Amino acid sequence: MEHYLSLFVKSIFIENMALSFFLGMCTFLAVSKKVSTAFGLGIAVIVVLGIAVPANQIVYENILKDGALVEGVDLTFLNFITFIGVIAALVQILEMILDKFFPALYSALGIFLPLITVNCAIFGAVSFMVQREYNFAESVVYGIGAGTGWMLAIVALAGITEKMKYSDVPAGLKGLGITFISAGLMALGFMSFSGIKL
């Protein structure tokens, strides 16, 4: 149990997808204007990562890994296309669920919901799972933890961006400029976790 807890904390703070690896920056910067929208997208990312990482772990271990199907047959060259296909299918299912049961959130997320399919944070988490050879339980914990870390980062940036509306930001830095500076300062804060070994 301690191993899974340390993996969860490590994936949130020490190896934060957005602020340590700088993955998923397109949606991270574009949807971080309102806390409510950022929170909704963060929940969607947690759900997708919490399902996509273990689903791809099952596919990798039982189909793609060297000798999984037939002795001597290595299908790892199909990793990228297979992982993207699984992620795309999961995002389509999530999109249909949000459209049916949460139409306000669905319309608020707009084009960024289908973009989760090609969000490099999702694919990065799946790639890290393969590289680090996580088992099924570890992949579930890692997927949920990585999604939680990404959500924590985007909600924090959205909160800062909302507060910046009431600040006297220089004209040359308004908009994306101050967002980059804020994200950079947040990343510096998260660097303080990098020396922690769990």
UniProtKB/Swiss-Prot annotation:
Origin organism is Glaesserella parasuis serovar 5 (strain SH0165) (Haemophilus parasuis)
Q: How does it assemble?
A: Composed of six subunits; NqrA, NqrB, NqrC, NqrD, NqrE and NqrF.
Q: List, in alphabetical order, the Gene Ontology terms for molecular function in this entry.
A: oxidoreductase activity, acting on NAD(P)H, quinone or similar compound as acceptor
A Pfam family cross-referenced in the UniProt record is Rnf-Nqr
Gene Ontology cellular component terms for the protein in this record: Gram-negative-bacterium-type cell wall; plasma membrane
Transmembrane stretches, by residue range? Answer: 11-31, 35-55, 77-97, 110-130, 140-160, 176-196
Q: Which reaction does it catalyse?
A: a ubiquinone + n Na(+)(in) + NADH + H(+) = a ubiquinol + n Na(+)(out) + NAD(+)
Protein name in the entry: Na(+)-translocating NADH-quinone reductase subunit E
The highest taxon in the source lineage is Bacteria
Asked if the record carries the keyword Transcription, the reply is: no
Q: How does it sit in the membrane?
A: Multi-pass membrane protein
Q: Which family does it belong to?
A: Belongs to the NqrDE/RnfAE family.
Summarize the protein's role: NQR complex catalyzes the reduction of ubiquinone-1 to ubiquinol by two successive reactions, coupled with the transport of Na(+) ions from the cytoplasm to the periplasm. NqrA to NqrE are probably involved in the second step, the conversion of ubisemiquinone to ubiquinol.
